[in-house]
Design a protein with these regions (language model features):
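Boundary/linker segments flanking structured domains
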Residues: 1-50, 58, 71-160
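GIY-YIG nuclease signature motif recognition
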Residues: 53-55, 62-69
Length: 160
């Protein structure tokens, strides 16, 4: 493995608030959002694009993986319909270049990998169908998933 730089930005200056995490030479970044800070996320334009997201129950080591065209709207729905989680992580493109089919493909890869590695109890009942993406994109999306594993500390979608 080669050296990588991870940068974390604290928009409100607090470790208990939202964190924006970027990885050198990566086309994705992560928004780490405590459930109690959801409304503060409304100010961030980047989360209004297609995203892969993780809902996490820190106490019980549980994980739900999903995809959305607009993370903020989706997570607000989950705020009312899913009680188990206390932390959300949204993975978005730095260039707003991910399409719905790309995100669905990433979701399928992420659920499959998370279920295999058993880093956390995965609450997804099934592995989403692997969406058809252009063969030129497959390598890029698999590389993104490797970056996502690093951005999430390797514990959510762990290395095999």
């Amino acid at each position: 493995m080669k050296p990588r730089l991870i940068q974390t930005f604290l928009p409100d200056g607090s470790l208990e608030g939202i964190k924006v995490v970027e990885l050198s030479e990566s086309s994705v970044k992560a928004f780490v959002v405590p459930r109690i800070k959801l409304n503060e996320l409304r100010k961030r334009q980047e989360i209004n694009q297609p995203s892969l997201y993780l809902l996490i129950n820190s106490a019980d080591n549980q994980l739900y993986i999903g995809e959305s065209e607009n993370f903020f709207h989706r997570v607000k729905n989950h705020d009312q319909s899913k009680d188990f989680w206390d932390l959300a992580i949204a993975i978005v493109s730095n260039t707003n270049s991910l399409e719905k089919s790309d995100i669905k493909y990433l979701e399928s890869l992420a659920v499959e990998k998370a279920q295999k590695t058993a880093a956390m109890t995965v609450l997804n009942r099934t592995i989403p169908a692997r969406n058809n993406v252009h063969e030129f994109k497959v390598h890029t999306l698999e590389k993104m998933l490797e970056d996502i594993a690093i951005l999430t500390g390797g514990t959510l979608i762990a290395e095999e």
